[in-house]
Amino acid sequence: MMEGHMLFFLLVVVVQFLTGVLANGLIVVVNAIDLIMWKKMAPLDLLLFCLATSRIILQLCILFAQLGLSCLVRHTLFADNVTFVYIINELSLWFATWLGVFYCAKIATIPHPLFLWLKMRISRLVPWLILASVVYVTVTTFIHSRETSELPKQIFISFFSKNTTRVRPAHATLLSVFVFGLTLPFLIFTVAVLLLLSSLWNHSRQMRTMVGTREPSRHALVSAMLSILSFLILYLSHDMVAVLICTQGLHFGSRTFAFCLLVIGMYPSLHSIVLILGNPKLKRNAKTFIVHCKCCHCARAWVTSRNPRLSDLPVPATHHSANKTSCSEACIMPS
């Protein structure tokens, strides 16, 4: 029988999974449609597309791990593929790191020759950075192919057996490689984000001293800083918990262990929502999707109220009028 708190955490993980898949799925679909229509993809869109795709796969893995830890599926199935999960997680971290570097290069104002060089070339470097990340993660994983398959499996299975010993000293070096793989992108990301926050803070101070500065401009600047700060906090929490789990510093079945799983799943879902809210194109498409769903729901409810036998029939797609009637107005139908 599953304990009450484990059942609660499992339900929260499922909600995180659905939220993350919807948010990341929206990013993937919007950018894929643009690629089909225009036969090309902007550097930022390419980064978002790769990041969202890796996060969808990662959240599937997190959900499957939670099911295994809850004894709803055989944990050995996940243990046999835990190296793949590590690769996807590290790729996701690298893509998020390059996203932070891209924002820093495009937004920050730093009078340094190296930064100016990066600012001029970051758009052309994005595809190469993505390719380099894939090659780096793949090569570093398969250099120690046997150990990288045994160590994560040992860590995962140790959560189920009290007789399983912790990581052997012979694996201590390899464990440090795992931790280094998580730490390196975090250090690059932290430097980029701190430079960006410093630049935005200096710009905010200049705006305060300027006469006639518009309030919306200040609000947009504060929103950008909060968005970047939330990015940093989520990234940091995800990295810390991942390192803690790798070092087997948690007791399986405890509330702390379950909470750490929630933190790991929180990063790819919540940050994708932050990305949507901060990107005008994604935000516009998200609003269109929500309005369309509401209109379809209202139309189905009206049809069902008029004739319950028609409740199983599909509702045809609705088209907005020229004056863009809101969903609430469209739902006011004569009885």
Curated annotation (Swiss-Prot):
CDD domains reported for this sequence: 7tm_TAS2R1 (cd15016)
The chain's Extracellular topological domains, given as residue ranges, are 1-7, 65-81, 146-176, 246-256
- Cytoplasmic topological domain ranges are 29-43, 103-124, 198-224, 278-335
GO molecular function ontology, one term from the record: bitter taste receptor activity
Q: Where are the transmembrane segments?
A: 8-28, 44-64, 82-102, 125-145, 177-197, 225-245, 257-277
Mainly resides where? membrane
Point out the coiled-coil segments of this chain.
none
Which Gene3D superfamilies does the record associate with it?
A: Rhodopsin 7-helix transmembrane proteins
The family database entries (InterPro entries) matched by this protein are listed as:
TAS2R
Q: In which tissues is it expressed?
A: Expressed in subsets of taste receptor cells of the tongue and palate epithelium and exclusively in gustducin-positive cells. Expressed in 15% taste bud cells in circumvallate and foliate papillae but only in 2% in fungiform papillae. Expressed in the gastro and duodenal tissue. Not expressed in colon, liver, heart and kidney.
List of glycosylated residues = 81, 163
Topology in membrane: Multi-pass membrane protein
Q: Does the keyword Glycoprotein apply?
A: yes
Question: Subcellular location, in the record's words?
Answer: Membrane
One GO cellular-component annotation of the UniProt record comes to: membrane
Alphabetically sorted, this entry's keywords are: G-protein coupled receptor, Glycoprotein, Membrane, Receptor, Sensory transduction, Taste, Transducer, Transmembrane, Transmembrane helix
Tell me the protein family, please.
Belongs to the G-protein coupled receptor T2R family.
**Job description of the protein:** Gustducin-coupled receptor implicated in the perception of bitter compounds in the oral cavity and the gastrointestinal tract. Signals through PLCB2 and the calcium-regulated cation channel TRPM5.
Miscellaneous comment text of the record: Several bitter taste receptors are expressed in a single taste receptor cell.
Could you identify this protein by its name? Taste receptor type 2 member 119
